[in-house]
Regions:
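Sec-dependent signal peptide recognition
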Residues: 2-9
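N-terminal signal peptide c-region/cleavage motif recognized by signal peptidases
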Residues: 14-17
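N-terminal alpha-helical modules
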Residues: 20-189
Length: 189
C-alpha cells in the first residue's frame, strides 16, 4: 500500500510540475522576469497560452508577413518589466495584450461589424469592438493607422486606451486623443 501511495504521489508531482511550466525551458531562464514566470503558475499559464495563440496566428499569416521579429521585440519588452514597480502585473499585462493582438491580427476571432465615426478635421475613424475578449478590446482604423485599445474603467460611457491613443464614447459622441491631437466625433448614421 505504501509503495503504491508513493508511486502515485510521485506521478502527481511530476504531472503538476509539467502543467505549471511555461513554454520555454526554465533551466535556461535569464533575468528576473523569466525566473518569475517559471515560479508563478499564473504567468506560466499565460506563457503557454501565448505560445499556442502565436502558433495558431502564424498558421493564418502569409510567411512574408509573419511577425517573428516583432515577437522577439515583444519578448524584450516583456523582460523590461523588471523595471516596473509591480513586475508581476506588468508581465501579466504584457502577456494579455500580446495574446489579444495576435488573436486579432491572426484572424482567430470573428470580426464584428464596424462602427464609423465622423470627427470633423480629424480623419474618419472605423472602430471594431471585440466584446468577446476580456478586457473588451477595439481596433480603431484611420488614415493608414490601425490601433488596438483596451476598455478601461470610466465614470460613464466606454473608454478605450492604447499606446498614445484614447477613445471615450458616450451616447454616440466620442472624444479622441492621439498623441497631442484631440477631436470630437459622432457616430455616422
Amino acid at each position: 500500500m505504501t509503495i503504491r501511495f508513493w508511486l502515485m504521489l510521485t506521478l502527481f508531482i511530476s504531472f503538476s510540475s509539467l502543467a505549471a511550466s511555461p513554454s520555454f525551458d526554465c533551466s535556461k531562464a535569464s533575468g528576473e522576469v523569466e525566473i518569475l514566470i517559471c515560479n508563478d503558475e499564473g504567468l506560466a499559464k499565460l506563457d503557454r497560452q501565448l505560445a499556442s495563440v502565436y502558433r495558431q496566428a502564424l498558421a493564418n499569416i502569409p510567411a512574408a508577413e509573419q511577425p517573428k521579429a516583432m515577437q522577439r521585440g515583444w519578448i524584450k519588452g516583456r523582460n523590461d518589466c523588471w523595471k516596473s514597480a509591480d513586475v508581476r502585473q506588468c508581465t501579466a499585462q504584457n502577456y494579455q495584450s500580446r495574446i489579444i493582438e495576435l488573436q486579432i491580427q491572426g484572424g482567430l476571432l470573428e470580426v464584428p461589424s464596424s462602427v464609423v465615426f465622423d470627427c470633423g478635421e480629424f480623419p474618419q475613424i472605423s472602430a471594431v469592438f471585440y466584446t468577446q475578449l476580456d478586457p473588451i478590446t477595439a481596433v480603431f482604423s484611420f488614415d493608414d493607422q490601425q490601433l488596438i485599445a483596451s476598455n478601461v474603467i470610466s465614470a460613464s460611457g466606454a473608454k478605450y486606451q492604447g499606446q498614445n491613443f484614447e477613445f471615450w464614447e458616450h451616447h454616440g459622441e466620442a472624444s479622441v486623443r492621439y498623441f497631442d491631437t484631440a477631436a470630437k466625433c459622432r457616430i455616422r448614421k
